[in-house]
Amino acid sequence: MSPALAAGLQIASVVAVLALVYVPLGDYMARVYTSSSDLRAESWLYRLARVDPRAEQTWCGYAGSVLGFSLAGVLVLYVLQRIQGVLPLSHGLAGVSPAVAFNTAVSFVTNTNWQSYVPETTMSPLTQSAGLAVQNFVSAAVGMAVAVALIRGLVRVGRGGEVGNFWVDLTRGTLRILLPLAFVIALILLSQGVIQSYRSGFTGVGLDGRPVTTALAPVASQEAIKELGTNGGGVLAANSAHPFENPTPLSNVVQILAILLIPVALTRTFGTMIGNRRQGLTVLAVMAGIYAVILGVTTAAESGARGAAATAAGAMLEGKEVRFGIPGSVLFAVSTTGTSTGAVNSAHDSMSPLGGGAVLVNMLLGEIAPGGVGSGLYGILVLAVIAVFVGGLLVGRTPEFLGKKLRRREITLAALAVLVMPALVLIGTAITVVLPETAAALGNSGDPGTPGAVHGFSEVLYAYASASNNNGSAFGGLTVTSDWFQSSLGLCMLFGRFLPILFVLALAGSLAAQPRTPATAGTLPTAGAGFAGLLTGTVVLVAALTFFPVLALGPIAEALQ
């Protein structure tokens, strides 16, 4: 089978399955978040937590619940890592060091899953299952809850800023959406050979005749939610390149589908909840258009040959698993950087300068194609607010979005939400590259302007882009075990997650308190090809104005050498 045919079949299968589940899953999630009835298990949890499921929260109360729940998650996960050596199923592993425990706790609670450790030799099965896997569920549910709160802000009229009940949204998202889907995906992965074991491992004989110890872990259960919740942290160091995590081309396609499933279907949920499904299709069209362009650029870059080894092989095969090839590796890379997943089935650091630059740009666009679970939707809706404001300036009208006026407060909150990530990326990169100890952490270095120095700069830029966007993937040539990287990247993950959430919830509260303004002849239509073009242009323009200079110093300069 030719690479072109393989690529076409994989893309077609992913698109076909997403098209089949788009309507039923999107409408189901809308019913989950608008239903007035509770499941028996949910009612029991509400009584246990002393939560009134019928009580509404203002955006301040909702934000306080998000922050309080997440802070508790960081503390519990940190303590669990520190004391894992004295807990059951430790398999002889000691407690995790304070710096790594902090970085990991922040990473998993913020849905980033940045891993500055080797999972097999650092985390016990108990820590993996009771700590990291739990956060994979609830951190995804938090993102979905915030997206739904913003939708309610657009729908509700004069509700005093009430945007729902965080505890209800969190519980329903976990029990009714994430758990059932993860269970089904885990069964499919098990059928493909993904392992599920609490044994410490086994010893065999390698090709050279020497004993080789192979680690085992409860992989299938965590692999499912790792992809479904756009988390990305692997149970094994090689992540989805490891045959125990991703053994076959079919399991690879299943994981790609799991990554894209909820972010894509949430656009249908958005359209259903606001009562105008064309709005959801417009948002989906923008996401799909950006995704297709990045996929095309990356595929073209990786299908060529650059350097002696690539020329001999006929393509950029370094760092890629032969069972996936170029098509499966590129499709996975674009999916994982277009969302907040960060899982990898190939080495992004080994990609061509243009291919690596494309997946980096995918993150720098704000991860909105189609974005993380929940975060992708509220991210692109914030950009839609900016686009409507720009459109209003062009025609001299007061901007309105779905019947809500966009006043100074709303535009300010939207702008702040958009600016958080670029500020973290640029400030973090600038400080890091001037520190003397950074040179020792670089896998690629050299005199200024040389290929090694340029790629080393790209490694640093990629790290802070990944952390600030809560992605978690990395250019593996950068060693991030120092206290500076552990703390600075941890802070980027925290601020990159929760500052935009605060601004989005404040925007939701402000919109919910407004009356609805009837549409007039001067109202900018926000459904259809015209607005899709305006929104796409806004996304590209914001990213280009912000990041083109720094990209010119890294991937672009490297590609031109």
Curated annotation (Swiss-Prot):
InterPro entries: KdpA (IPR004623). It holds the Pfam family KdpA. It is a multi-pass membrane protein. The keyword Protein biosynthesis does not apply. Keywords: Cell membrane, Ion transport, Membrane, Potassium, Potassium transport, Transmembrane, Transmembrane helix, Transport. One of its GO terms (molecular function) is potassium ion binding. GO terms for cellular component: plasma membrane. It is found in: Cell membrane. The chain crosses the membrane at residues 5-25, 60-80, 86-106, 131-151, 177-197, 247-267, 281-301, 376-396, 415-435, 489-509, 531-551. PANTHER family: POTASSIUM-TRANSPORTING ATPASE A CHAIN, POTASSIUM-TRANSPORTING ATPASE POTASSIUM-BINDING SUBUNIT. Belongs to the KdpA family. Part of the high-affinity ATP-driven potassium transport (or Kdp) system, which catalyzes the hydrolysis of ATP coupled with the electrogenic transport of potassium into the cytoplasm. This subunit binds the extracellular potassium ions and delivers the ions to the membrane domain of KdpB through an intramembrane tunnel. The system is composed of three essential subunits: KdpA, KdpB and KdpC. This is Potassium-transporting ATPase potassium-binding subunit. It comes from Nocardia farcinica (strain IFM 10152).
